[in-house]
Amino acid sequence: MDRQPTAVVVGGGIAGLAAATGLAERGVAVTLVEAAPRLGGRVRAWPVQADGSATTMSRGFHAFFRQYYNLRALLRRTDPTLSRLRAVRDYPLVLAGGHTDSFAGLPTRPPLNLMAFVARSPTFTLRDLARVNADAALALLDVSFPRTYEDYAGRSAAEVLDELRFPDGARHLALEVFARSFFADPREFSGGELVAMFHTYFLGSAEGLLFDVPYDDYDTALWAPLGRHLESLGVRVVMPVKATALEDRRERVGVGLEDGATVEADVVVLATDQEPLQGLVASAEWLGNEPWRMRVAERRTAPAFAVWRLWFDRPVREGTPPFLATSGFGPLDNVSAVHRFEAGAARWARTRRGSVVELHAYALPDGTDEAALRVELRNQLRELHPEVDRATVVHEEWLVRDDCPLIGTEPWADRPEVRTPDLRVTLAGDGIRCDYPVALMERAATTGWMAANAHLARWGLRGHELWTVPMDGRHRVVPHLRRALSSSRLTLS
């Protein structure tokens, strides 16, 4: 191209930020359009007043796992040593009336990490191990992505767990928690995605299930610095304004905005949430053929989830973990002691001699009574932290959202991918298909980089490296063991 190429990135979440960064760093003139007043998408933070003091709120705690290589590459643009992330030493999982598991102190080398977890976990007994379906368990080691996604098409996470015959405690604590982290009911969530997570966190990497968190709210620690970095690269950030339409302008594409303006560019990256993406594609009848458009339109949204942040006038007990996953506590899925890791919340708690506690409830049934839900969440919190029963709530923030993509049991190949039928338009986000065993924030970042790379390749410009855990199982003996197991069954029968 004999002039500077141009791009519009629609969406200022992780996917859009990665795409904008990838394009701008190669000299592309980028306009970034974001509907909210702050960057970060579903991982943004915004200011609130808590009992007269300035503090922040977000859509809830997010774990920055060590396997999030491509997200971390994005964060290194403004924080080369990742000093704004703080390690969380443990990720305890508690089952009501029963066991607690931990991922701290495990060996780093697979499969020793998994073996050590099983050996020390109170949720596994020798009798339980004897009941485990050996072939289904070995299949977790015998993976090859993206083929494994296809192999599990039509099977839910719940069905995969049923096949494994893990003990109930381990099923709830070690695996079902994963499905609900996608805000999904395990009966609706993809079994292939569950297997991919098992590979990523246990069997395909040494980082395990320990993670980091930002030292302060998301805007302060992550996205505001990245926004300034983008502006230093010449990116024009337009917010808050929604993109409402896509226009075919011969060699270029126009993006219509709700204020009546149109931004025109050589290429467009659609890095929005799922429903805005579906609306933009529906408005652009020229984009793609009918089968592709149907694939986009048929994507489903995960059930609603609730986040309840409570500012108490008393501290929670000493030693409260920053993050606690739960199972069997009614609708309560996890509890975060926000003041244990977020600087703004910590300042508030020190000043008031109080605490800031956040409750999450995922995969809410349709028609959930929010008032009744709040009562039940508070009752379950009392079971875990009876000391707050005497505390006064001096401020609270309650939100319910239902805008996360559902990674369901449909065939993997039916999910929209980064490239569209029109070379000028790409997609990015945590609901967009890619070959790698990645998920959530890392899938958003990865597809954002991929979208940028797709356009850069057309212009003959250098793309950006992508990293992932190994795409295949790391244990060559496993396929032979599975064949031997199958042969022994045939002989016995």
Where in this protein do the model-derived segments appear?
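Dinucleotide-binding Rossmann-like beta1-alpha1 core, especially the glycine-rich loop
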Residues: 52-137, 146-147
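Active-site/ligand-binding neighborhood in enzyme catalytic cores
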Residues: 136-245
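N-terminal Rossmann-like FAD-binding beta1-loop-alpha1 element of flavoenzymes
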Residues: 5-32
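Glycine-rich FAD pyrophosphate-binding loop
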Residues: 24-50
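Conserved Rossmann-like nucleotide-cofactor binding loop
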Residues: 15, 38, 275
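Conserved flavin/dinucleotide-binding core of flavoenzymes
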Residues: 105, 317-493
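Mid-domain catalytic core of redox enzymes
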Residues: 26, 241-357, 362-368, 384, ...
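General small-molecule cofactor/ligand-binding pocket signal
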Residues: 85-86, 236-240, 396-397, 426
